[in-house]
Amino acid sequence: MTVMAESGVVRAGVLDVAFERHGNANGWPVVLLHGFPYDIRGYDRVAAALADAGADVVVPYLRGYGATRFVSSDTMRSGQQAALAHDLLELIDALGLTAPIVAGYDWGGRAACLVAMLWPERVSGLVSVSGYNVQNIPASGQPAPPEDERRLWYQYYLHNERGRAGLAAYREDYTRLLWREWSPNWHFTEAEFTATAPSFSNPDFVDVVVHSYRHRYGLAAGDPAYDQTERAIEAQPVITVPTVIVDPTEETLSSPDSRAEHETHFTNLVELRTVAAGHNPAQEQPADFTAAIQRLHTQA
């Protein structure tokens, strides 16, 4: 049986969050969180499979993407990690979800990790791509080897106004290039890319993205509303909730870590699952990503 998705918008803190919901509202709750530069279309097959398995699956557009909008024009268009965490927490409250499994990659994985880290009682489990997806901003000035720095060109590009103008003018070219670079063995179709590309036309996309890639290096001030949360993150606490890590083996931004390395950040690591995928494993290998979530559900 395939369960059709319903679309909705809910007031959640400073946002009106656009989302799709799959399955039965009385099912076991899951929130799937996309990364940059992707959107909810990357979870279509995962969400359908989980709904068929009895889950209540919520897939939101992050701030700056798709039909999600800021409630007030006065709210800072922040892309900082604490803002993403609060967005997820507010969404869980707004939809009345009880201890969902939260799963994500890139920006979405960061939001999921942070809520699991700072408010562990609010979630029942975590699926995180590439592990401890938490920025250590005080240490961001420490250089990496040149080969690693080269891969981060897309971040440094946005550190000046030429990059901001470039993202605004060439957002589809920029994002398509990142899809190709980060997942070299994923031969996505033009239809797959064009299904997601409209999300980058959100009026706040450029501001949120640029702020994200400046704030993480200490090059832009954060929203004062999140100062307390950012201070809590600086301590780099361990994550104690049941966790499955999905480590992609074809990702070009990072390499898989050993279980021992991951366990320095996760005290309840249920499974370390390596997957033949690049940066977007939910869309590239949906069966593996679905299985990671189901592993947490069946052990609960």
Language-model segments: which ranges?
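Nucleotide-sugar-dependent glycosyltransferase donor-binding/catalytic pocket residues
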Residues: 38-39, 77, 252-255, 279-282
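Flexible "cap/lid" subdomain of the alpha/beta-hydrolase fold that forms the substrate-access gate
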Residues: 2-5, 16-17, 29, 65-99, ...
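Catalytic active-site module of serine/aspartate enzymes centered on a nucleophile-bearing elbow/loop
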Residues: 269-300
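Short acidic-hydrophobic surface loop/beta-edge motif
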Residues: 6-12
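Conserved acidic functional residues
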Residues: 35, 106, 283-284
